[in-house]
Amino acid sequence: MTLLEFFRSILRRLGMIIFPSAFKTMSVSVKSSSAEVTVVETTGSLHTLESLKDEVMRLFRSPCTLRRMLSMSSALRIQYKAKLQESEACMLPSYCHALPNGRETGTYISLDVGGSTLRIALVELHGRESQNPMVIKHIASSKIDEHTRRLPGTEFFDWMAGKITDMLDQTKEAWPPQTTLPLGLAWSFPIEQTSHRGGKVQGMGKGFACAETTLGMDLGELIEAACARRNLNVRVDAIVNDSSATLLSQAYLDPATSMALILGTGTNAAAYLPTGCMSRSKFGARDQSWFDKADRVITNTEVSMFGKSILTETRWDELLNRQHQRPDFQPLEYMTTGRYLGELLRLIIIEAVETGELFGGVMPELLREGYSLDTEVMAKLEMDTTKTMQQSIAMIKKAFGLKKAPSLKEVKFLRTATESISYRASAYMAVAVHGLWALQKDTDINPTTPNGTPKTSIACNGSVILKYPGFKDRCEGFIRQMTDTASSPAGTFTAEKIVLEPTNEAAVFGAAVAVALADAP
């Protein structure tokens, strides 16, 4: 601590003793479009560490009552319905209008292209009743490094074709000579889909240069052409995004599956909805023959974009939003996902440091930059339930670059803040899921549940929902509370059970299932 920082800390403490009324927190109520009033706390004040801890708990946990969650779910359902009619950014129907019946079989190539990794797998589907319904016979993973991201135009697809060649060289026994190889693609970037097997390339972001000269070109044709240049007879039969792939992979195993949730660094959800509940303009220039077959369609909800003026915010949420490059763009994502949970804790730490009681009033050097606090730190804090918290003390000292170990009081403050942030995140995600489930019931998707089953299965994937301590169980518990109550917006469907089902290798299996559906008569 510098001499100046020391004197500032002393002055803060004196001010809190001499003029305590000047340091009281003020609260201002603002209107919300939901039935509840959103309370946004504002402060020009300094707290003790203990009073700030109590305030953090209150602000993050108070919206998580059953009554308020049901109110937010109802408001979200109204927002979902509106976007089914008008938005070009969310509630986007795919070309996949059928769910698997579990009898699809075959051998397929699955290609999973993400922001940092390319995975290629040889997948066998044996049928739902088989002992091993879905099997990965071979899988290869390649890092997409900075050099690869910068490959221009078709060179990136040539690189992909090279990796496909390498994998096929190791699995020649699976394919008779001269066979056309069916490929399913899980594509984690924007695409304007034009058919089940094709779509126009959009800007990819994340440092990828290939889209600059292939913008608007057909993605399936680009991959097939790159493979042809290597004398590979590959046919792209299906293109799906991550949420659709997750839904398909679980639906192959469980006929009660009609939704999927991705919750990791970001979030998204897919829902199986009636085509009739959407504006015809949503479907673009599709042939009437498609509509003749498509009573329902897997819909990319882009659920991260919902929740503005519905989900109750704290002053730290408002600060994060104001400082974001795209304020208000993804309200739900900013309050629930791996990228932002750590940043919310960092913003609370900044305020706690200002009390002079956290880290001696000095902001840790490693936390001065935005988004420098990894959500993994929060997960480790929540896992430490010991009285002395020695592991957490050592972990925080290292993670924050502190010169001396934090006190037990400081680490308990951090754990309380962490638990409050993740508690609300699981509640808000439950609210979003419950709203989508109620939307399915409203649109007559399955009033008696699929195939007469007594539950709705929601396929889940992503590091937060699957790996963050207690997150999935809490989220499922909140959903159960909302569906069990007689005041549920879904009304007559309150007896139904909603289960969050973890998925394994969802992108790889989902892409293969999508190909099998494309092959179906």
Spans of features found by a protein language model:
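Short loop/turn segments at strand-loop or loop-helix junctions that form parts
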Residues: 114, 139-144, 185-190
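Glycine-rich phosphate-binding loop of actin/hexokinase-like ATP-binding domains
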Residues: 129-136, 206-216, 247-346, 350, ...
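Short glycine-aspartate micro-motif
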Residues: 108-112, 182-184, 240, 258-262, ...
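Conserved beta-strand elements of beta-rich interaction domains across eukaryotes
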Residues: 115-116, 125-127, 188-192, 244-245, ...
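Glycine-rich phosphate-binding loop and adjoining helix at the ATP-binding site
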Residues: 141-161, 191-251, 256-259, 275-307, ...
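A general secondary-structure junction signal
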Residues: 185-189, 241-243, 504
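ATP-binding/phosphotransfer module of carbohydrate and carboxylate kinases, centering on a glycine-rich
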Residues: 1-138, 147-181, 253, 317-521
